[in-house]
From Swiss-Prot:
CDD domains: Ribosomal_P2. Transmembrane segments: none annotated. GO terms for cellular component: cytosolic large ribosomal subunit. Belongs to the eukaryotic ribosomal protein P1/P2 family. P1 and P2 exist as dimers at the large ribosomal subunit. This is Large ribosomal subunit protein P2.
């Protein structure tokens, strides 16, 4: 992702065809070392392509991917209906998650009561 971001920065900065050196310079300015193999792959894949078209294609792919918990909830509901004992382990998992969250919250102040 860092290589794509640096490539986009170079293109948006006016360099229509950034070289590996250009990308390394951008990444180096924020302290990131570039791996030549990955860098060359990104440059090879994006070279000569219109960035706006690449971004539009990416948005199209992302919009077609399912996101959120709707699919997981439907799958979980079907499993509980199919197996009568499927609901008990789920309840145990929820209890464990709540317990872990409360332990994490108690560690937030690390023993220092700033407002006590």
């Amino acid at each position: 992702m860092r290589y794509v971001a640096a490539y986009l920065l170079a293109v948006l900065g006016g360099n229509a065809n950034p070289s590996a050196g250009d990308i390394k310079k951008i990444l180096g300015s924020v302290g990131i070392d570039a791996e030549d193999e990955r860098l060359n792959k990104v440059i090879g894949e994006l070279k000569g392509k219109d960035i706006e078209e690449v971004m539009a294609a990416g948005r199209g792919k992302l919009s077609s991917m399912p996101s959120g918990g709707g699919v997981a909830a439907a799958a979980g509901g079907g499993g509980a209906a199919a197996g009568g004992g499927g609901a008990a382990p789920a309840a145990e998992e929820k209890k464990e998650e709540k317990k872990e969250e409360s332990e994490e919250e108690s560690d937030d102040d690390m023993g220092f009561g700033l407002f006590d």
